[in-house]
C-alpha cells in the first residue's frame, strides 16, 4: 500500500485537488488490521507518482518471494548425520509459511539412481559439464556418474512436485553416500542451484529454504556456506589491514563448503575430491567437489530458521567477499561483515543458529527483512549486525 502525496499548492491544489494521503493511509492500515489482511507498507509510504512507482518496484521481489513460498515443495533425502546434529528442522513452520515438504529415504534415491544407469541423456550431461569446467575438468572419470545423478534428481523433481510450481532439495552427502554412490554430490548440487533448484548439503531443510528465498529475491544464483573459520593473522596483516576499509580481524571470517558453489560464483574452479572425507576413504569415492575462491563483491549473509521448539527466527547481514586469496580448499571466500564478532556472538550463537548460512550476491537485506516480516517472523526475532555503540540485549556493557 502506498499513497499519493500532495503535488502542488498552485491553482487550488490544496483546495479542490487535496488528496489527504496521510489520512487515507491511516484508514487503510486500520481496515487492513480489522480484516486480518497482511499488506506491505513501505518505510515511508507517501510519495509522488515517480516515488510510488519506485516503491512498487521495490515491492516486486518481496511479492515474488511470498508467492514462491506458497508454491514451493521441499524434497529431502535421508536424516541428518548422527555425528553432526546441527540443523534441526521442525516442519510445522514450513506449513505455516505455505511450503510443503516430502521426506524420502536415501534408499529410495539410491534405487532411482541405479535405475538411471545407461540413461541416454548421460552423454549430453557429461558434455555440458565438460564445457562448464573447461580447464578445471580434473576428474573426467567421475562425470558420467555425476550426470546420472543429476538426471535422477531432475526426474525426481518432475515426478514428485505435484501441483507445486517450485522445488528445493535438502540432500544427503555423507556418511554412506560416497561409499554407495561412488562420488560426492557437491558439483551436481551447484549446477541445480544455478538452474533455480537450490540444493542444500547435509539435509539442511531450512538452509535450502533460505537459498530459495535468496534466489527469488535476488533473481540470481545463491550458495550455502559454513560460517567456518577465522582468518589467520598473517593473511589479515598482509592482505586486508589498511587495504580493504576499516575491517578489524574480528570483522572477517571464512565461508566454506566442500564444493557446492556454482561455477559462475567462483573466481576460478576445478573439479576435485572431498579432502576431509578422503582422510579416511579412498579418494576415488570422494570425487565430485567444485573448488575455487568465491567471487569478490557485495553479499548478504542470511538465514530463516525454525528453532527446535518451532519458533521462526531469522538473521540478515550485509557484507562483502574480499578480493583476497584464501590459500585453502573447497568453495571458499574471505568474508567481511561490519561488527561480525559481536553479531556472531549475540545473534548467531545466542540465537542457536546452525553453522550454515545462505549467501546472496549483492545487498538484499531491505527486501529480505520485509519478506521475513511479511511471512510471520516476529521483528524482535530478526537479527542483524548492529553498528558499534548499539548494544545487543545480551551484550555485557562492561566487556
Residue spans for each PLM region:
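Cap/lid and interdomain-hinge subdomains that line or gate substrate/regulatory clefts
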Residues: 6-125, 132-135
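A glycine-rich phosphate-binding loop feature that marks nucleotide/adenosyl-phosphate handling sites
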Residues: 168-175, 226-242, 387-393
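C-terminal catalytic subdomain
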Residues: 193-329
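Extended hydrophobic packing segments that form well-structured cores
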Residues: 276-399
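Short, solvent-exposed amphipathic alpha-helical segments in soluble enzyme
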Residues: 89-96, 184-189, 374-377
Amino acid at each position: 500500500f502506498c499513497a499519493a502525496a500532495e503535488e502542488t499548492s498552485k491553482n487550488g491544489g490544496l483546495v479542490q485537488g487535496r488528496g489527504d494521503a496521510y489520512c487515507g493511509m491511516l484508514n487503510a492500515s486500520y481496515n487492513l488490521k480489522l480484516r486480518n489482511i497482511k499488506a506491505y507498507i513501505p518505510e515511508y509510504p507517501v510519495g509522488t507518482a515517480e516515488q510510488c512507482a519506485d516503491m512498487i518496484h521495490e515491492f516486486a521481489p518481496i511479492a515474488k518471494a511470498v508467492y514462491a513460498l506458497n508454491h514451493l515443495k521441499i524434497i529431502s533425502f535421508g536424516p541428518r548425520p548422527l555425528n553432526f546434529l546441527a540443523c534441526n528442522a521442525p516442519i510445522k513452520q514450513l506449513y505455516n509459511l505455505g511450503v510443503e515438504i516430502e521426506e524420502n529415504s536415501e534408499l529410495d534415491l539410491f534405487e532411482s539412481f541405479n535405475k538411471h544407469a545407461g540413461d541416454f541423456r548421460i552423454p549430453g550431461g557429461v558434455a555440458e559439464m565438460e564445457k562448464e569446467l573447461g580447464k578445471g575438468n580434473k576428474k573426467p572419470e567421475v562425470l558420467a556418474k555425476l550426470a546420472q545423478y543429476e538426471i535422477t534428481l531432475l526426474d525426481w523433481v518432475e515426478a514428485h512436485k505435484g501441483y507445486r510450481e517450485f522445488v528445493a532439495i535438502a540432500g544427503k552427502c555423507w556418511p554412506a553416500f560416497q561409499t554407495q554412490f561412488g562420488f560426492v554430490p557437491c558439483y551436481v548440487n551447484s549446477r541445480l542451484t544455478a538452474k533455480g533448484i537450490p540444493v542444500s548439503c547435509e539435509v539442511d531443510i531450512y538452509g535450502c529454504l533460505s537459498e530459495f528465498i535468496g534466489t527469488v529475491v535476488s533473481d540470481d544464483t545463491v550458495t550455502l556456506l559454513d560460517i567456518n573459520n577465522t582468518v589467520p593473522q598473517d593473511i589479515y596483516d598482509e592482505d586486508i589491514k589498511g587495504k580493504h576499509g576499516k575491517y578489524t580481524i574480528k570483522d572477517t571470517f571464512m565461508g566454506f563448503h566442500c564444493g557446492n558453489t556454482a561455477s559462475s560464483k567462483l573466481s576460478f574452479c576445478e573439479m576435485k575430491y572431498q579432502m576431509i572425507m578422503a582422510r579416511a576413504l579412498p579418494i576415488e569415492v570422494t570425487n565430485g567437489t567444485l573448488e575455487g575462491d568465491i567471487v569478490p563483491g557485495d553479499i548478504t549473509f542470511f538465514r530463516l530458521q525454525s528453532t527446535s521448539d518451532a519458533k521462526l527466527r531469522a538473521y540478515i547481514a550485509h557484507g562483502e567477499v574480499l578480493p583476497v586469496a584464501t590459500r585453502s580448499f573447497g568453495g571458499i571466500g574471505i568474508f567481511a561483515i561490519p561488527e561480525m564478532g559481536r553479531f556472531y556472538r549475540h545473534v548467531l550463537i545466542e540465537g542457536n543458529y546452525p553453522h550454515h548460512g545462505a549467501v546472496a550476491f549483492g545487498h538484499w537485506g531491505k527486501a529480505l527483512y520485509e519478506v521475513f516480516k511479511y511471512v510471520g517472523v516476529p521483528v524482535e526475532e530478526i537479527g542483524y549486525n548492529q553498528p558499534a555503540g548499539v548494544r545487543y540485549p545480551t551484550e555485557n556493557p562492561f566487556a
